[in-house]
């Protein structure tokens, strides 16, 4: 068996990365793609590797030189018109090579783990196209297969239909052809197709024609979770660098992204909590039905959004400002009330108190913390520890603040997930404590809409709210987020049911976590469960282990925080933990 790599393309979409180099010279985590794949091919006992080169071909040949002479025999074919042709011409230049031996055919812009090549080489079937179930990041040629893994259709980019994605598999651009298949089927069709359609086409089009006109001997070989990525642009390169980072670096590579984990479909994010039982399918269907209109329309200004949010919260429009997530709330508060000073969070000191291992605190603890501060933030329920103070205890602190000229800012984003907590967001409470209380809530979090970034800040002090509004851009949330706010009241009973489901699942999840000997599980009434590691590992070490198993978690010191997700997702995590 031999290998052929098509490496003649210019890779224009990679911009500066391919300004002076071909795509396979691009580095992922300090290793060039060409070095990686040659080493992988070198472990397969192949007779030779044939590289079809073009753009910056001499530079590639000079780089390879004789460094792999003891690994694999390397030969070259030149495509002198690489800038006027596509990969069908590069492959046509190698047609005689294809007919000489069984061949692994690869493109030069893919990165994959070792098992990918082992999977296709070890499979006894002679003619295979490696494929993977469609995911949102995939682009290019798709195939449809039957239950025998026969390819019934090649779907070019122009024929792609999003409504059919459940039936699509993406070609990984790794093929295995027997020399008989190349000689008797593929190469004759390749010659004919090139003569009719020209040389600015893709070689997959030939396979598409074969499936239409010929009982093809080519079968699909679906991957089973093996990692791979196609690198077409700088964003792809960034994602591939994260996917293929080494064990110690991988967790930090993911963590520094902060979010956007939808780009990694295999990853389940337990680092940030959100309501997994809301919105309902019906609410999402309503949002989808209006999506085209919403993305083509400007959102309303602050006053309209505050009116809608106030209606949902049960408070007057003049007491509410709508923000683009909690991050915007904290930013505007620092610029208005705190004049650039750091916000003080109540739990920060308690985290350092070894005499309080469960991080429990009550009204008296908060008052003591407040003694030398003009204002502070109380997260209730606390997202880190899961501690939750009853409404009467929180109001005890607010009363004390009022008597001492201080301000308590309460973040109650998780209050609907708690057993004991109760919202402070009402006209009566806000008006009574207009000088000493401000309330914040992340609607995105409680309603399971983290991608829409919606938060509210409320106070009975209308002048303060007015100042906050003036410091926030009028169009600070988009039309889709505004629409979600607008229709929420229609689904309020579903929302309440979702919170009950959340509490029930958290109880089950906590009980299951308590069965692991390496955890001390701290009781929680928030959207996450805090676990102390008792096996000597640090949180970072533990999270590094989890990320290798496609689980993202967060923590500090010896404490790991695990968000409560759906039963299905939680069971995935429990299965991972059981195998440790």
Question: Model segments located where?
Answer:
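N-terminal nucleotide-binding beta1-loop-alpha1 segment
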Residues: 1-18
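PLP-dependent aminotransferase class I/II
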Residues: 436-515, 519-521
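Conserved beta-loop-beta/alpha segment of the NTase-like Rossmann-fold superfamily
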Residues: 69-141
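Conserved core of the PLP fold type I
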Residues: 293-402, 409, 414-434, 438
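Conserved N-terminal catalytic core of the sugar/cofactor nucleotidyltransferase
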Residues: 2-5, 31-101
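Conserved PLP-binding catalytic core of the aspartate aminotransferase-like
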Residues: 502-507, 513-549, 564-566
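Conserved core of the sugar-phosphate nucleotidyltransferase
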Residues: 113-197
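N-terminal "arm"/small-domain region of PLP-dependent enzymes with the aminotransferase-like
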Residues: 239-296, 372
């Amino acid at each position: 068996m031999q290998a052929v790599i098509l490496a003649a393309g210019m890779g224009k979409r990679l911009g500066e990365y391919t300004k002076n180099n071909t795509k396979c010279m691009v580095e992922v985590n300090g290793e060039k793609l060409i070095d990686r794949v040659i080493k992988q091919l070198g472990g397969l006992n192949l007779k030779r590797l044939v590289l079809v080169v073009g753009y910056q071909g001499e530079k590639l040949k000079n780089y390879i030189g004789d460094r792999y002479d003891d690994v694999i025999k390397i030969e070259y074919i030149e495509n002198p018109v690489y800038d006027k042709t596509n990969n069908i011409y590069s492959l046509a230049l190698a047609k005689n090579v294809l007919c000489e031996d069984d061949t692994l055919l690869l493109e030069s812009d893919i990165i994959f783990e070792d098992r990918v090549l082992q999977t296709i080489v070890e499979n006894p079937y002679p003619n295979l196209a490696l494929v993977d179930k469609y995911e949102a990041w995939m682009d290019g040629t798709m195939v449809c297969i039957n239950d025998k893994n026969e390819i019934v259709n090649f779907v070019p980019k122009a024929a792609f239909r999003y409504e059919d994605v459940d039936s699509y598999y993406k070609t990984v651009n790794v093929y295995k052809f027997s020399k008989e298949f190349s000689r008797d089927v593929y190469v004759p069709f390749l010659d004919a197709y090139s003569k009719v359609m020209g040389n600015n086409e893709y070689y997959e089009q030939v396979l598409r024609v074969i499936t239409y006109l010929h009982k093809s001997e080519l079968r699909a070989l679906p991957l089973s979770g093996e990692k791979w990525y196609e690198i077409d642009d700088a964003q792809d390169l960034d994602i591939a660098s994260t996917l293929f980072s080494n064990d110690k670096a991988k967790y930090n590579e993911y963590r520094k992204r902060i979010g956007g984990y939808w780009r990694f479909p295999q990853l389940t994010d337990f680092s940030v909590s959100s309501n997994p039982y809301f919105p309902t399918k019906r609410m999402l269907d309503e949002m989808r039905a209006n999506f085209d209109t919403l993305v083509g329309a400007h959102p309303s200004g602050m006053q309209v959004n505050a009116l809608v949010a106030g209606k949902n919260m049960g408070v007057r429009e003049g007491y509410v400002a709508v923000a683009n997530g909690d991050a915007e709330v904290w930013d505007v508060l620092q610029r208005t009330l705190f004049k650039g000073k750091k916000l003080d969070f109540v739990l920060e000191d308690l985290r350092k108190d070894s005499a309080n291992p469960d991080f429990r605190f009550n009204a008296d603890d908060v008052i003591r913390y407040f003694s030398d501060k003009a204002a502070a933030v109380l997260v209730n329920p606390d997202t880190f520890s899961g501690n939750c103070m009853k409404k009467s205890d929180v109001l005890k602190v607010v009363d004390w603040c009022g008597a001492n000229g201080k301000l308590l800012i309460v973040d109650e984003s998780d209050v609907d997930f708690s057993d004991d907590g109760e919202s402070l967001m009402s006209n009566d409470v806000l008006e009574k404590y207009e000088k000493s209380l401000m309330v914040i809530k992340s609607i995105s979090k409680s309603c399971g809409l983290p991608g829409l970034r919606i938060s509210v800040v409320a106070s009975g002090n209308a002048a303060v709210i007015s100042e906050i509004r003036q410091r926030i851009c009028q169009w600070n949330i988009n039309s889709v987020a505004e629409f979600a706010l607008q229709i929420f009241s229609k689904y309020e009973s579903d929302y309440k049911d979702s919170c009950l489901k959340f509490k029930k699942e958290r109880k089950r999840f906590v009980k299951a976590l308590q069965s692991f000997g390496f955890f001390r599980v701290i009781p929680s009434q928030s959207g996450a469960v805090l676990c102390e590691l008792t096996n000597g590992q640090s949180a970072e070490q533990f999270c590094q282990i989890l990320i290798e198993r496609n689980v993202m978690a967060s923590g500090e010191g010896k404490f790991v925080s695990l968000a409560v997700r759906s039963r299905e997702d939680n069971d995935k995590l429990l299965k991972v933990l059981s195998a440790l």
